[in-house]
């Protein structure tokens, strides 16, 4: 439910709407969403991608961009719905392939026009996913990106 609450907030739902949906107080919603953003004590893991099918969490991907490492957790036994299928310990190359698989092809006709419409200066799968939530025509899977507030405490002087 924590991921669903964070996803609803990202989709523009108000805290009050989310609270009504889950029949909890607004304070509970605030606390749960804050919890969703505190997913790692590792200061190098600043981003988590939640790969969902509709509203069902399928895979979480904790990302360490500095050391080019990822750690995943699958939440479904349905292999086609997992971010990396049967691969239990994906590499950085697997991760970059996954990102590219959730975007339009780099070689697509009028790619520059599409990027311009998106407000992006160049083709970068991560930036595209931040704009599109990794949604693709023909499937109902998408990506929720969470930034780790816990990791920022060590670097944020405020």
What are these regions (language model features)?
Residues 1-13:
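Short, amphipathic alpha-helical "recognition" segments used to contact nucleic acids or chromatin
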Residues 30-31:
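Key DNA-contacting residues within the recognition helix of helix-turn-helix
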Residues 5, 16, 112:
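Short glycine-/small-residue-rich flexible loop motifs, especially phosphate/cofactor-binding loops
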Residues 17-22:
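Short alpha-helical "recognition helix" segments of helix-turn-helix
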Residues 35-158:
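Phosphate/dinucleotide-binding and metal-coordinating scaffold of catalytic cores
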Residues 25-27:
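Short coil turns linking two alpha-helices in DNA-binding domains
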């Amino acid at each position: 439910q924590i991921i669903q609450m964070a996803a609803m907030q990202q989709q523009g739902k108000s805290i009050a709407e989310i609270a009504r949906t889950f029949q909890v107080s607004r304070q509970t919603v605030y606390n749960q969403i804050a919890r969703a953003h505190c997913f790692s004590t590792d200061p190098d893991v600043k981003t988590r991608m939640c790969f969902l099918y509709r509203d069902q969490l399928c895979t979480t991907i904790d990302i360490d961009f500095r050391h080019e490492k990822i750690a995943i957790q699958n939440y479904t036994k349905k292999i086609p719905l997992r971010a990396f299928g049967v691969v239990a310990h994906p590499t950085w190359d697997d991760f970059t392939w996954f990102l590219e698989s959730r975007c339009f092809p780099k070689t697509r006709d009028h790619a520059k026009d599409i990027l311009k419409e998106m407000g992006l200066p160049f083709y970068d799968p991560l930036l595209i996913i931040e704009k599109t939530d990794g949604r693709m025509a023909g499937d109902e899977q998408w990506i929720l990106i969470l930034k780790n507030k816990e990791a920022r405490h060590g670097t944020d002087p405020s």
